[in-house]
A protein has these predicted regions:
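Long, low-complexity intrinsically disordered regions
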Residues: 1-305
Length: 306
C-alpha cells in the first residue's frame, strides 16, 4: 500500500483546490472582468472540482460560489458570480454535494439519483400523493414558460399550506428530473421543463448506476487529492450505498485509476484512503515547492462581530 504524510496530503489538497501551483493541475490563475474568457476560467475551476456549491455564507454576507471563485481567480469581478447564475450549457444545477452547479457532462451520471428521487428524500412520495398538483404545475410551466418560486404565490385557496406544498412540489419535480433550473433570479430558482434546459444529447445517454458511482468517486478524488472512502461518500451524498461503493472502488483499483494509500500522521497512525496514481507523481513535484507561511492548514480564522 502507498503512504502519504500529513504535509504531503495538505500540499496535494491545496494544489487540487487550485490554491497551490494551479498551473500544475490545469487551474486558471486569472479572470478579469465579465468577459467570455473570464467566464471560461470560472467554468474551468468548476470542472476541476466537479461541482460548485450554491449557498449563502450569512456571516460573510456573500454567496459561497463567489467566495470560492474570488479566492482562486486573480482579478475576479463579483459581478461575474451573479452573471454565472444564468449558467446554461456547459453547467446545470442539481443535487451534487448540496445544490450545486455541475458540468453538463454529469447530467447522464446523475440519472440514478433522479430515479431515486422520484420519492423525495425529505418529503417522501410527494408527487404520488399530489398527482394533480404535479400535473398542473408541469402544465403551467409548459404553457406559460419558466416559473420562479415567487410565481407560485397566490394560486392556492388554502393560504400558506398550498404555497408550501407547491414550492415543495417544484423542488420534488426538479429532483426527479421532470423540471430543471433554467437560471437563478435574485438567487431564486427559475424552473422550466427539463427538455427546454438540458440538450437531448445529455438527456438520452443515462449511465448505469455502477458506472455513475465509479465516475463520481473518481471525480471526487480528483478534487480532494487524497481522501478516505467516507470523504468520497460525503462529497456526493452517496448514503446507504455501502456495498455498491465498495464494488465501484474495487473496479477502479482493477482499472488502475486509483490506488490504496494510507495517510500516516505525526504519531505514526495510519488512516486508509485513496489517491490517483498521477497525484502521487504530483506529490513528488510539490515536495520541491518552497512552503509559505500559513500555506498549510495550521492557521486560525477569526470573525469580528460588531
Amino acid at each position: 500500500m502507498e503512504t502519504i504524510n500529513l504535509t504531503q496530503a495538505r500540499r496535494l489538497a491545496l494544489a487540487r483546490a487550485g490554491l497551490l501551483k494551479p498551473e500544475w493541475t490545469g487551474m486558471p490563475r486569472r479572470a478579469t472582468g465579465v468577459t467570455r474568457r473570464a467566464r471560461q476560467a470560472a467554468h474551468r475551476v468548476i470542472q476541476g472540482f466537479g461541482y460548485l456549491q450554491l449557498d449563502t455564507v450569512a456571516v460573510a454576507g456573500a454567496r459561497s460560489h463567489a467566495i470560492v471563485l474570488l479566492s482562486r481567480l486573480e482579478g475576479f469581478d463579483p459581478a461575474l458570480a451573479e452573471a454565472l447564475l444564468q449558467p446554461g450549457e456547459p453547467l446545470f444545477e442539481y443535487w451534487g454535494h448540496e445544490a450545486c452547479w455541475l458540468p453538463i457532462k454529469l447530467f447522464p451520471v446523475f440519472a440514478f439519483r433522479r430515479k431515486a428521487f422520484q420519492q423525495h428524500p425529505w418529503w417522501g412520495d410527494l408527487i404520488g400523493q399530489h398527482p394533480r398538483m404535479a400535473e398542473n404545475l408541469t402544465h403551467r410551466i409548459r404553457e406559460e414558460g419558466p416559473l420562479r418560486s415567487l410565481d407560485l404565490e397566490g394560486r392556492g385557496s388554502r393560504g400558506w399550506w398550498d404555497l408550501k406544498i407547491a414550492k415543495r412540489m417544484a423542488t420534488a419535480l426538479w429532483s426527479a428530473g421532470v423540471l430543471a433550473i433554467r437560471e437563478r433570479a435574485n438567487f431564486q430558482r427559475v424552473y422550466d421543463l427539463t427538455e427546454r434546459v438540458i440538450p437531448a444529447c445529455w438527456r438520452e445517454n443515462a449511465l448505469a448506476k455502477g458506472d455513475a458511482l465509479e465516475h463520481l468517486l473518481l471525480l471526487g478524488l480528483q478534487g480532494h487529492g487524497w481522501a478516505t472512502t467516507g470523504t468520497l461518500v460525503q462529497t456526493w451524498r452517496l448514503r446507504n450505498e455501502g456495498e455498491a461503493i465498495r464494488a465501484a472502488l474495487a473496479r477502479l483499483v482493477d482499472k488502475g485509476a486509483i490506488v490504496a494509500c494510507a495517510l500516516v500522521d505525526d504519531d505514526g497512525r495510519r488512516l486508509p484512503g485513496w489517491v490517483r496514481p498521477q497525484d502521487l507523481e504530483l506529490v513528488d513535484r510539490l515536495q520541491r515547492v518552497r512552503p509559505r507561511k500559513d500555506r498549510g492548514h495550521r492557521f486560525g480564522i477569526g470573525i469580528a462581530r460588531g
